[in-house]
UniProtKB/Swiss-Prot annotation:
Catalyzed reaction equations: UMP + diphosphate = 5-phospho-alpha-D-ribose 1-diphosphate + uracil; cytidine + ATP = CMP + ADP + H(+); uridine + ATP = UMP + ADP + H(+)
One annotated GO molecular function: uracil phosphoribosyltransferase activity
Residue ranges, annotated region (Uridine kinase): 41-246
Region of interest (Uracil phosphoribosyltransferase), ranges: 256-466
Underlying gene: UKL3
Native organism: Arabidopsis thaliana
Record's protein name: Uridine kinase-like protein 3
Amino acid sequence: MASKSDVNIIETSSKVHFSGFHQMDGLASNRPEQMAEEEEHGQPFVIGVAGGAASGKTTVCDMIMQQLHDQRAVVVNQDSFYHNVNEVELVRVHDYNFDHPDAFDTEQLLSSMEKLRKGQAVDIPNYDFKSYKNNVFPPRRVNPSDVIILEGILIFHDPRVRDLMNMKIFVDADADVRLARRIKRDTVEKGRDIATVLDQYSKFVKPAFEDFILPTKKYADIIIPRGGDNHVAIDLIVQHIHTKLGQHDLCKIYPNLYVIQSTFQIRGMHTLIRDSKTTKHDFIFYSDRLIRLVVEHGLGHLPFTEKQVVTPTGSVYSGVDFCKKLCGVSVIRSGESMENALRACCKGIKIGKILIHREGDNGQQLIYEKLPSDISERHVLLLDPILGTGNSAVQAIRLLISKGVPESNIIFLNLISAPEGVNVVCKKFPRIKIVTSEIELGLNDEFRVVPGMGEFGDRYFGTDDE
């Protein structure tokens, strides 16, 4: 623990542009909340498909399902969650607005989706559009799946439902096409006459589309014009889904989390540095190799511009030129072990330092910083080999942001990450990027990463026997 004299020495001996130690009040180093129960299960990939009535949502869902034949996939329709029409409303059912958000039992929809995300089977009601009741027996049994497609006109309306989705698709179609499809569908499938369909369209469907459905288009990640006729868009969506299904569950939740592709070589190096019997020399050697891979991967996320050069043969090569304004910031002291790899990759790079030190049991922290004066103009590679609770990372990132560094300009590099720390950092800072080589099982009761690799700084710098 740093004494007052230590603080004064550091502050007075440093004649540069940093402010020494900062007293941070009320910053508890408590363990973050445990991951939600559903994250302990294999996380399904949830796709929301919204759009106006008869825009082609069902066709798009069917085509996605057909191309996901090798995956467990299921479609959940918002139509299944209509409220029952009571006896009073049934007398004037033609004046009942089925396109209003209040027509749906959103709470039941949320309950069913939460159970599916937790790996539990659910019974979903079957809604009868002739009796306007959801008591058709038997209910539809939906089992847990790798992919859940949630389809409906208003699934983007409630933010709680939107937050369940990993991908949001809006199916767009011309108004006249949607009207023609609706007339055909409602007369054939729902037993309605054309006059009733047109009356309902002008009274409820069209106003609801303009008031409630169209405004949710802004939440979509992907907009598909022409619906099921757009085969190129659907093929690209399916490719993206296959990519996500091959990733760690946390990568499906947080698009700003990147885990380098695992190979036998990488797993072999992890085996060596995790082994408590590995010598200091071998630990440093293989740690440096892994760190170099993480650094190289992190550099690949920097912005670039196209550049043409002339080769010794006189030919023109079209390549790229990465941004010049770059610096590293290591979290003392374990983060300093990553500096050599960064210098080897980026000759002459400036490297700053941050020390986050807990003082006593009151949760207060001392922060020491030594950063480039123009850090607000640079892309920052934040270095810390282990992401555990996420407390230190959060404080380091907040400090960088307070210095004017845009959140999107920070790339956090580490060797291993605990899910608890990933959740904390990604939720608080959704625009930073985290690059790691492996996701751990979690934290134990002593807040240590498991299976982990012990106290990294002590093992790397040879102070574990002191």
